[in-house]
């Protein structure tokens, strides 16, 4: 998990919304994900990214909704995912968005 955290950054992310009911039994991984993304080190990678914790008392399924700056959306249902799986998926989407964004910029290195 430490390796996934070392490279985690929010540069292409516009908003992260984490929704869960704290009284359900399957929210630990979602809460761990929220704690990781809310850390000062990760938040400092993009000060314009808003991290929203939506805590409800309605028995709803834990959910993470990530909105990227290019309009791409990642929705993870946290009931049956571990924190590591959520962080790994999040990091891979961030790398994909970074690669897509850098390819659109003029003068970007094409590797030729």
From Swiss-Prot:
Tell whether Transit peptide is among the UniProt keywords.
Answer: yes
Q: Which InterPro entries match?
A: mtLSU_mL53, Ribosomal_mL53
Principal localization reads mitochondrion
Q: Name one Pfam family in it.
A: MRP_L53
- Give the keywords, sorted: Mitochondrion, Ribonucleoprotein, Ribosomal protein, Transit peptide
Biological process (GO), any one: mitochondrial translation
Compartments it resides in: Mitochondrion
Q: Which GO terms describe its cellular component?
A: mitochondrial inner membrane; mitochondrial large ribosomal subunit; mitochondrion
User: What are the disulphide bonds in this sequence?
Assistant: none
| Keyword field contains Transit peptide | yes
Q: Which family does it belong to?
A: Belongs to the mitochondrion-specific ribosomal protein mL53 family.
Q: How does it assemble?
A: Component of the mitochondrial large ribosomal subunit (mt-LSU). Mature mammalian 55S mitochondrial ribosomes consist of a small (28S) and a large (39S) subunit. The 28S small subunit contains a 12S ribosomal RNA (12S mt-rRNA) and 30 different proteins. The 39S large subunit contains a 16S rRNA (16S mt-rRNA), a copy of mitochondrial valine transfer RNA (mt-tRNA(Val)), which plays an integral structural role, and 52 different proteins. mL53 is located at the L7/L12 stalk.
Record's protein name: Large ribosomal subunit protein mL53
């Amino acid at each position: 998990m430490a390796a996934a955290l070392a490279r985690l950054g929010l540069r292409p992310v516009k908003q992260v919304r984490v929704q869960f009911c704290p009284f359900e039994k399957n929210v630990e991984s979602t809460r761990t994900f929220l704690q990781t993304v809310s850390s000062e080190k990760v938040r400092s990678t993009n000060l314009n990214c808003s991290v929203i914790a939506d805590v409800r008392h309605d028995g709803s399924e834990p959910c993470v909704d990530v909105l990227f700056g290019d309009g791409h959306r990642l929705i993870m249902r946290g009931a049956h995912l571990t924190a590591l799986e959520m962080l790994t998926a999040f990091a891979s989407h961030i790398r994909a968005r970074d690669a897509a964004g850098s390819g659109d910029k003029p003068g970007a290195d094409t590797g030729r």
